[in-house]
Amino acid sequence: PPLEAVFTVDEDIGMLGAAALDMSGLQGRVLLNIDSEDEGILTVSCAGGATSCLTVPVKRVPVQGNAWRVGVRGLTGGHSGVEINKGRANANKVLAAALQGLPVTLCSIAGGSKDNAIPRASEAVVVSEADDFAALFAANAAKAALPETEQHAEFYCEPAEAGEMLAESEAVLDLLNAVPNGVQAMSSDIPGLVQTSLNLGILTTDAD
C-alpha cells in the first residue's frame, strides 16, 4: 500500500499543528508514530492531551500588614509527559501547601512557564499582620513532604513592597491545594505505563 507521511508542528505547546491538520486526503488506517526520540524506534500508539485554564476572578483591596516575597526554587522539574511518574515535585503545589493555613493574604502568585513542564520554581508576594510571619512560613515550609528527588529545593522569605492584595486569597489557595496533580492512573495492560496524568504547569496573576 502507499506510504503517507504526516508532519506537524507545535506539539509541545498544545498540539496546534495536529489540531489544524486537514485529514480528508489521508487514506491510511495504520499509524506509525516516529516521535519516539530514539533513532530506529517506531511506536504504535494512541495518546492525547488537553489544556484546561482555570480562572478565579479577584477583587483588589488596599494592603493591610507587611508585604513579603516568598517562594520555592531549585526543584528538579522535567517533562510532564515523560517524567511525570518519577516522583518530582510541582513547585506551584509545593508553595500553595506551604502557605495554606498561615495568616496571609496574596498579592500575586506565579510559577511555571510551559503546560508540559513540571514547574521548578514558584513565587508569591503576600501580606501578613503577623510579626513573626517569616518564622511561621519557615515552619510550614519545613513540613513540606518533598520527595527524595528534590535535594536542592530551597524556600525563601524576604521583605517586599505591595500596594494591593487579593480579597479572594483563601479561595485561590484552597483551589491550588485541591487541584489534582501528577499520575492519576496507570495502564492495566502495560506495566509501568502512565495512562492519565495532570500537571499544574502555569500559574499567573494577571491584571483585570
Where are these predicted regions, by residue range?
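Alpha-helical metal-binding/catalytic segments enriched in His/Glu/Asp
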Residues: 1-12, 68-74, 79-102, 124-129, ...
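A residue-level signal for beta-strand positions that form part of recognition/binding surfaces
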Residues: 2, 31, 51, 67-69, ...
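Residues that cap or initiate secondary-structure elements
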Residues: 11, 38, 60-62, 76, ...
